């Protein structure tokens, strides 16, 4: 199935297979908290994504309705009671735990409201670049982090690549990179295989919601020095 993104928003700029996978994992509760929050905002902005998410949620609900109850054997029930009584929980690592959703940061409709995000408290990193942290620690070497990034109109970002994945949702303004223009409502997906230097569109500061798995990898020595201080 493919999604046709025809709406007042600009066309979605990452491969549809990536979007479909993200939405399906969102509907199934398989996304990490930061990814979950970002996709939730994208769904609020884009009616096509919202429709696809609703479809996947309905399919999941239908599958659950078709599950037939199975009687449990006394032996199984006894084993469960024994575990509860003597405090030996099953420590099974599960990256697909639906409880991730419960732990996700609250996604306010304010994040997709231009006036609200422009009037948030921002921490200046360098002239023309500011950040508003939402989840995680940008200065740690590893670990998912979610933040709002605001960059002045017309500014060119330093050339960089990534450690792991970066998901970005444009909330205001836009930028150009690799021959493409990303504007409000667009999702942009990057990883360590690509190096780029986005240029912010003229006329309006660019604000995006960004999820990264680790700090950016700057290509030049001066941005590297600055990064050690400000973190991003």
Whereabouts are the PLM-identified features?
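Ligand-binding loop in jelly-roll beta-barrel domains
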Residues: 194-218
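Short glycine/proline-enriched turns and hinge-like loops at secondary-structure junctions
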Residues: 143-144, 161-163, 180-182, 201-202
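Conserved short histidine dyad/triad with adjacent acidic residue
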Residues: 117, 130-162, 189-195
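Short alpha-helical interface segments
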Residues: 2-14, 20-28, 33, 37-106
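Glycine- and acidic-residue-biased ligand/ion/polar-headgroup-sensing regions
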Residues: 152-155, 161-177
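Short acidic-glycine-tyrosine-enriched beta hairpin
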Residues: 177-197
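Alpha-helical membrane-targeting segments
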Residues: 218-232
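A short, N-terminal "cap"/entry segment at the start of jelly-roll beta-barrel domains
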Residues: 88-139
């Amino acid at each position: 199935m493919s999604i046709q993104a025809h709406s007042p928003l600009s066309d979605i700029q990452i491969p549809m297979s990536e979007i479909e996978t993200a939405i399906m994992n969102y509907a199934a509760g398989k996304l990490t908290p930061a990814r979950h929050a970002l996709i939730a905002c994208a769904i609020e902005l884009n009616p096509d994504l919202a429709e696809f998410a609703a479809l996947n949620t309905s399919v999941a609900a239908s599958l659950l309705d078709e599950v037939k109850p199975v009687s449990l054997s006394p032996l199984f029930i006894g084993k469960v009671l024994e575990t509860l009584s003597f405090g030996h929980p099953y420590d099974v690592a599960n990256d697909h735990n639906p409880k991730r959703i419960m732990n996700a940061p609250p996604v306010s409709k304010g994040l997709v409201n231009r006036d609200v995000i422009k009037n948030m408290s921002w921490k200046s990193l360098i002239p023309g670049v500011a950040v508003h942290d939402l989840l995680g620690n940008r200065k740690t070497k590893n670990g998912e982090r979610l933040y709002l990034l605001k960059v002045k109109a017309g500014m060119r970002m330093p050339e960089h690549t990534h450690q792991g994945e970066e998901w970005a949702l444009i909330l205001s303004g836009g930028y150009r990179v690799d021959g493409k223009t990303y504007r409000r409502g667009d999702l942009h997906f990057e990883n360590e295989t690509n190096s780029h230097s986005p240029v912010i569109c003229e006329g309006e500061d660019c604000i995006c919601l960004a999820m990264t798995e680790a700090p950016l990898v700057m290509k030049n020595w001066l941005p590297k020095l600055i990064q050690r201080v400000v973190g991003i």
